[in-house]
Amino acid sequence: NHGLAPEERKSTYPAPIVLGRNVWIGSNATILQGVTIGDNAVVAAGAVVTKDVAANTVVGGVPAKIMKHITK
């Protein structure tokens, strides 16, 4: 992201987004920096993911929350 103080606004602090295996991302979903999405997870369309997503879950909303656990 970036600093809030005027002298820090030009600096950014990038972090990777890590996607597990077999992840589905819906259209217009926003995933913030530093988030890890676990294996077999689904991110609903339009969701804003601000925290890590556990494996085998469906998340959605603003901010994204667990909507369902996927059972095999």
PLM regions and their residue ranges:
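Flexible, glycine/small-residue-enriched loop-and-beta-strand segment within the central core
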Residues: 1-35, 70
